[in-house]
């Protein structure tokens, strides 16, 4: 799997991903919020793959956030690294399952809460982020929601 690398505007990619999920969120009464550091601008990477990571994280947040919940996307830059997080007020993930969610074909949680999906979204997201030289992880607590965070090096064409 290769990256198609070019400079692209990360804040615009975040805005575009939010636009794509806004209607689904609205239908379920889920509030979408976002906060982007104004110092964050163009980065060098594969825009399509980064957008796919954002959409995977937002789609998962929508699946697991109850009606009336909230999803926030934030992005900041520090030490030449862009850090993007997607936080939801969903069901949360048990500590023992937090690494397993990134495995292929793996879905965690209770069997009575069957959710559509292949179990590939987070595995692909990890692959795409790591191809960029970044990291992805989750912080979560059962019953209070999850925050998925990924980092990307801020490299710009010289």
Predicted features along the sequence, with ranges:
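Conserved catalytic submotifs in the C-terminal HATPase_c
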Residues: 4-9, 26, 31-41
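Short helix N-cap motif at coil->helix boundaries in the Bergerat
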Residues: 10, 92-100
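Short helix-loop "hinge" at the ATP-lid/N-box region of the Bergerat-fold HATPase_c
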Residues: 61-62
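Short beta-strand/loop element within the Bergerat-fold HATPase_c
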Residues: 68-80
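Glycine-rich ATP-lid/hinge loop adjacent to the conserved G-boxes
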Residues: 106-116
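Short alpha-helical Gxxx[C/S/T] motif in the catalytic ATP-binding
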Residues: 121, 125
